[in-house]
Regions:
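Long, intrinsically disordered, low-complexity, charged/polar and glycine-rich segments
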Residues: 1-117, 123-126, 171-175, 281
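Beta-strand-dense domains in secreted/periplasmic systems and polymorphic toxin scaffolds
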Residues: 70, 80, 121, 187, ...
Length: 281
């Protein structure tokens, strides 16, 4: 009697290069624009197959070939996704100790894609702009899901294929959610411009959340430099440096704040930034 089905369609929002709007997928699997610019949307490569149990237990992820193609009235084609580095996704897990020792996630839930990032622009004359993203794996962690799992009373006898309740035990348990974000790595513009913009990033010196949770968390990243090359020759570069401030709180909930401390431009010089927030590291 507690089984319920959600028939409300998911709303997909898009916003790129001056075009914005929303669309839904109807019961026949076709996209329908519900507001915003008129565009043609191709979902033929948007794969949503259920994962195998092995995929669920070993750092699961969406199908890597999933992509959305949007064509605007001026004939430009915009491609989103198409590889895992350009898909933002998240999933729930159990048995948190498995994260610490690098083992599988032991999850009984499928992972959901939250966003598809722009990977390519194709002009009517076939000129292209390509966007690539860093292969980061999971970059965020949240331990509040237990508040929801307390309400699970056991799986019903009949389950829809993609049910979130599949194989969950009748008793409550502590669970975790992990999120994989997309971090832009480079933009390449072909002839006649022959430009490449590299966004160089590294693992931050300190993690920017509760110190007591750091053992469970993946590293976060910081932007170190933006490098522009033209015809394979250096053209312009900006380097960034950061400072950290330790914030001590009660209940072992201390954390760091990060501040931009210096910007160096190859064609201008350096800028120093100072803050009135106490000592920095």
């Amino acid at each position: 009697n507690n089984l319920a089905f959600d028939y409300q369609p998911d709303i997909f929002h898009f916003n790129f290069c001056g075009h914005s709007g929303s669309f839904i997928i109807d019961n026949d699997g076709n996209p329908t624009v519900i507001n915003g610019d008129f565009v043609e949307i191709d979902l033929s490569n948007l794969v949503n197959d259920e994962q195998t149990q092995n995929e669920k237990e070993n750092y699961p992820h969406p199908k890597s070939s999933a992509k959305i193609i949007i064509t605007t009235l001026d004939g430009y084609q915009y491609i989103f996704g198409g590889n895992l580095s350009a898909i933002e996704y998240s999933g729930g897990i159990r048995a948190a100790t498995k994260i610490k020792d690098g083992g599988g996630m032991c999850t009984s839930r499928f992972v959901a894609a939250n966003a598809w990032y722009l990977t390519q622009i194709i002009a009517p004359d076939k000129r292209t702009v390509n966007f690539s993203y860093k292969n980061t794996g999971y970059t965020d962690y949240n331990d509040n899901i237990w508040r929801f799992t307390e309400h699970y009373v056991g799986p019903p006898t009949a389950l829809p294929k993609h049910s979130l309740y599949k194989n969950i035990t009748p008793t409550s348990f502590t669970g975790y959610t992990l999120s994989k974000e997309c971090i832009l790595e480079s933009i390449t513009i072909d002839s006649p411009y022959n430009l490449r913009i590299d966004f160089r990033s590294s693992v931050a010196q300190h993690k920017l959340y509760s110190v007591s949770r750091c053992g469970m968390c993946k590293p976060n990243y910081q932007l170190d430099a933006v490098v522009v090359t033209k015809n394979n020759r250096p053209f312009r570069q900006a380097n960034l440096r950061y400072a950290y401030q330790y914030r001590e709180e009660d209940n072992d909930n201390s954390y760091y704040w990060r501040f931009l401390s210096r910007v160096t431009l190859s064609d201008i010089g350096s800028y120093q930034l100072e803050y009135g927030h106490g000592s920095m590291e």
